[in-house]
């Protein structure tokens, strides 16, 4: 049996797997830049998600996302994540997507753009459900941005402020380095699989509550503060019970999560009704955390203000992970292309720590094997 090195850390924590030109989370400075451009500049200047997709994938604003094709969602399971994951995987046989190994970069880019807008369309169709009539395509075609088309396909007549809120959220969520779902997308892409398989696999990774479900878990805390009227007592109660304070702390940033800063400003600018209670909770939480853990810098993370912005845009809690998926398609596509160009299979190793050599007779249950043979 191999001896485990003393400095071994499971889960690839701290291991550098790739170099990338796509995004730079500045952990010490509290900034996030897409190909060198700060997300605060993108959101404050109302750059739409479709254009940010192009920035991440192409490195310029030349050619954003095209409109989604009027293609019906092929499955309605009642779960938005399942619907979009299955729908994307089915694009490969429907549209004849070849393996990444067998196509050039331009074709891969075109397929990724086509699949990305279909992911947005599938989320909107799934959320609207089968008990409401579909929004006529001619109305969707009148929309000027990909985000407006998404909101119209889902809600019919969305509030323009809600469209702006979703744009701000998607731009903030579009890319964040080597997280679990992005790594999954790159691993699948490294095998030469088709783009739909890589995107579908990334959605599967994001379905885990440790990655994509945190914004929805902030809302009950805001609800409780609105009922109690005392943010500090609610926060103290959560911490006294040993529960996790949702929306605070991040594995990457030592300073404030820049995405939280961007979305806080968006919530204030758009007049989100829960902005004031969210500010009260944030201030109470930060004060309490600093008193209890003066040796640790625990700041607000993106999930806290994402919950406020998404709630303002009338996104139900069970749909929030799917909205994260929509935004992150941009980063996934950029990394899939980057991995294709790298052309190297991702194949880490593992240290075996199981039993040493032994006979089958020495394994518990061998007698039952004999009786059924």
UniProtKB/Swiss-Prot annotation:
Organism for this UniProt entry: Mycobacterium tuberculosis (strain ATCC 25618 / H37Rv)
Family: Belongs to the citrate synthase family.
Biological-process GO terms, alphabetical: carbohydrate metabolic process; tricarboxylic acid cycle
Matching Gene3D superfamilies: Citrate Synthase, domain 1 (1.10.580.10), Cytochrome P450-Terp, domain 2 (1.10.230.10)
Sorted UniProt keywords: Acetylation, Allosteric enzyme, Transferase, Tricarboxylic acid cycle
Active site residues according to the UniProt entry: 250, 303
Enzyme Commission (EC) number: 2.3.3.16
UniProt keyword annotation of Acetylation present: yes
Catalyzed chemical reaction(s): oxaloacetate + acetyl-CoA + H2O = citrate + CoA + H(+)
Other remarks on this protein: Citrate synthase is found in nearly all cells capable of oxidative metabolism.
CDD domains, per database record: BsCS-I_like
Protein name: Putative citrate synthase 2
Pathway: Carbohydrate metabolism; tricarboxylic acid cycle; isocitrate from oxaloacetate: step 1/2
Disulfide bonds: none
Single GO cellular component term: cytosol
InterPro entries named among the record's database cross-references: Citrate_synth-like_lrg_a-sub, Citrate_synth-like_sm_a-sub, Citrate_synthase, Citrate_synthase_AS, Citrate_synthase_sf
Record-level Gene Ontology MF annotations: citrate (Si)-synthase activity
